[in-house]
C-alpha cells in the first residue's frame, strides 16, 4: 500500500463529548482515514500521542448551525459503538473544505475495501464476517423466526429486545436479540449493526458471549446468542453487598483473560461495568453486551449529554483525549473496587461533580482491604492512562503479574479449571430467577412468525434489503 500522507490540516474547535466546552485542536486528516488532533501544531507529523484519534472510514457527515454556526458532526464507529464528534470552524467555506476532504477520504477507503473483498474473500480474519459466513449457510439451512419458541423477555431497549428462545430442532436455549430495521436505518445504525455481527462472529473465548446464528426477516435483524442464566454480577453483589477478595480475584482473573483476548485482536471493549458481567450456570463470568443499554444517539440539536453510565467513564474519555486499551483497565478497576468495597470509587448524583471527582479525586479504601488489593486498585485507577497498570506495552500481562494475582495459573483460568466461588441456584436452563422481574413478567409481543414465509423475506421491499447484504450466519459452519 502506498505511504500515508496528509490530505488536510488546520485548527478547528472540537466540542467535548461529556464536558460540553469547546477546545481548539490542530487536526490532521490522513489518507488512511485517521483524523487526529493535537493541542499544539505538531512539528513532527509522527508524534506518538495525539489527544484525539479516530477514523473517518464509513463515517457520516452532518452540517448544522447549532450549537454554533459552521458546525459539522462526524459520526463514526468505535468497535460496535457509534460515536459522534462535533466541530466548528470560522467560515462556511472552511467547513466545506473539511467536509469535502473527509468525504473524499471515506469514499476512497470504501472503494478500496470493496476491491479487497472481491479479490480475497477469506484471506483475512477481519473479512470472514460476510463471505465465509454466508457460504456456511448454503450447507446449513438458513434460520428463520419459525425455528424458535419465544419464552421470556430478558431485556428491552431503543433498538429492540432480547428474548429467551428455545431452538425447536435441538431444544437448546439462546438469547435472541431482535432489532427493528426501520429503527436502525432511521438512526443510521446499519454500520454499527453489521460491525457488531462481524465482531461476534470472529470472537471465540470462554468468558465472552458467542453468536450462534444471525438472520434477517422483512423488517428485523436477529442475533441468536449464547444464553447464560446465572444472573448479572450486579444482582448478586447488591444482594451480598461485598464480595471477598478471593471471590473478586476469581472474577477479576476471568475478566482480565477476556480483555487480554480482545486487546490482542485490537478490540477495545470500552463498556466494562457490572451490568455487562453475567454468570453462567456454573458461576463463570460472561462478558455480554446485548447492545440495548445504549440509548442511541439523539440529533445534533438536542445533544444529549451522554449515553451509558457516567460512573464508569475513564478520565481520558471525559477529557476527550485519545483513549486506547487502558480505558478497559480503568473499567476493571471500577468493577473490582465495587466488588471489594461495596460501592463505586467515585459517585455524585450531580454529573458535573461526578466528573470532577473522576478527574481530580484520590480514591479512598476501607481499612479492611489488604495491601495487595489496595495496590491493584490504586494502579488500575491511575488517572493518566500511560501510567495506569496495564497502560504500558505489556497490557494485560502487567496486571497478571501483579501481587494480587500471584498464585493464579492463567492457563487454568482460561481452561475453566478453577472452581467458581459461587454456583448460581438455577434449576434448569429456562430458570430466569436471576433476571429482572420487570422484563420476565411481561408477555412477549413480536409479530407472529407465521406472517413470514419460510425464508422470512417474502415481499421484501427493495428499499430496505440492500442495507443488510449477506447477513445470515451459522456457527456450525465453523465448528
Curated annotation (Swiss-Prot):
It is found in: Nucleus; Cytoplasm; Membrane. Gene3D superfamilies: Phosphorylase Kinase, domain 1, Pleckstrin-homology domain (PH domain)/Phosphotyrosine-binding domain (PTB), Transferase(Phosphotransferase) domain 1. InterPro entries: AGC-kinase_C, Akt3, Kinase-like_dom_sf, PH-like_dom_sf, PH_domain, PH_PKB, Pkinase_C, Prot_kinase_dom. Residues 5-107 form the PH domain. The active site is at 271 (proton acceptor). Belongs to the protein kinase superfamily. AGC Ser/Thr protein kinase family. RAC subfamily. This is RAC-gamma serine/threonine-protein kinase. The lineage of its organism: Eukaryota, Metazoa, Chordata, Craniata, Vertebrata. The gene is Akt3.
Amino acid at each position: 500500500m502506498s505511504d500515508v500522507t496528509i490530505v488536510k490540516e488546520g485548527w478547528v474547535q472540537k466540542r467535548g463529548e461529556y464536558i460540553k466546552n469547546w477546545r481548539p485542536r490542530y487536526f490532521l486528516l490522513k489518507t488512511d482515514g485517521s483524523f487526529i488532533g493535537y493541542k499544539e501544531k505538531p512539528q513532527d507529523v509522527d508524534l506518538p500521542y495525539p489527544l484525539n484519534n479516530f477514523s473517518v472510514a464509513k463515517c457520516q457527515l452532518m452540517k448544522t448551525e447549532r450549537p454554533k454556526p459552521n458546525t459539522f458532526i462526524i459520526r463514526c464507529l468505535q468497535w460496535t459503538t457509534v460515536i459522534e464528534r462535533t466541530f466548528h470552524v470560522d467560515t462556511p467555506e472552511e467547513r466545506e473544505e473539511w467536509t469535502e476532504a473527509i468525504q473524499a477520504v471515506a469514499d476512497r477507503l470504501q472503494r478500496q475495501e470493496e476491491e479487497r473483498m472481491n479479490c480475497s474473500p477469506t484471506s483475512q480474519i477481519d473479512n470472514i464476517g460476510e463471505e465465509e459466513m454466508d457460504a456456511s449457510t448454503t450447507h446449513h439451512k438458513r434460520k428463520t423466526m419459525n425455528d424458535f419458541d419465544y419464552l421470556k423477555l430478558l431485556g428491552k431497549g431503543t433498538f429492540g429486545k432480547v428474548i429467551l428462545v428455545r431452538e425447536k430442532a435441538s431444544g437448546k436455549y439462546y438469547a435472541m436479540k431482535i432489532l427493528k430495521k426501520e429503527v436502525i436505518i432511521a438512526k443510521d445504525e446499519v454500520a454499527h449493526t453489521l460491525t457488531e455481527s462481524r465482531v461476534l462472529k470472529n470472537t471465540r473465548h470462554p468468558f465472552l458471549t458467542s453468536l450462534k446464528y444471525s438472520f434477517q426477516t422483512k423488517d428485523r435483524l436477529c442475533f441468536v446468542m449464547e444464553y447464560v442464566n446465572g444472573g448479572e454480577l450486579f444482582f448478586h453483589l447488591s444482594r451480598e453487598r461485598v464480595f471477598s477478595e478471593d471471590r473478586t480475584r476469581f472474577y477479576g482473573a476471568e475478566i482480565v483473560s477476556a480483555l487480554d483476548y480482545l486487546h490482542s485482536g485490537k478490540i477495545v471493549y470500552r463498556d466494562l461495568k457490572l451490568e455487562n458481567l453475567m454468570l453462567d450456570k456454573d458461576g463463570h463470568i460472561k462478558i455480554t453486551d446485548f447492545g440495548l443499554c445504549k440509548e442511541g444517539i439523539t440529533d445534533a440539536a438536542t445533544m444529549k449529554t451522554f449515553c451509558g453510565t457516567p460512573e464508569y467513564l475513564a478520565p481520558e474519555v471525559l477529557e476527550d483525549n485519545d483513549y486506547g486499551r487502558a480505558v478497559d483497565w480503568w473499567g476493571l478497576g471500577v468493577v473490582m473496587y465495587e466488588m471489594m468495597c461495596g460501592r463505586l470509587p467515585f459517585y455524585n448524583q450531580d454529573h458535573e461533580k461526578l466528573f470532577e471527582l473522576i478527574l481530580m479525586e484520590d480514591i479512598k479504601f476501607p481499612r479492611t482491604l489488604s495491601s495487595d488489593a489496595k495496590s491493584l486498585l490504586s494502579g488500575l485507577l491511575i488517572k493518566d492512562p500511560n501510567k495506569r497498570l496495564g497502560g504500558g506495552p505489556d497490557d494485560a500481562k502487567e496486571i497478571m503479574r501483579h501481587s494480587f494475582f500471584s498464585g493464579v495459573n492463567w492457563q487454568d483460568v482460561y481452561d475453566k479449571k478453577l472452581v467458581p466461588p459461587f454456583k448460581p441456584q438455577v434449576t434448569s436452563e429456562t430458570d430466569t430467577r436471576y433476571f429482572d422481574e420487570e422484563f420476565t413478567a411481561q408477555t412477549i409481543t413480536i409479530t407472529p412468525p407465521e406472517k413470514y414465509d419460510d425464508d422470512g423475506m417474502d415481499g421484501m421491499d427493495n428499499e430496505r434489503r440492500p442495507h443488510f447484504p449477506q447477513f445470515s450466519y451459522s456457527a456450525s459452519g465453523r465448528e
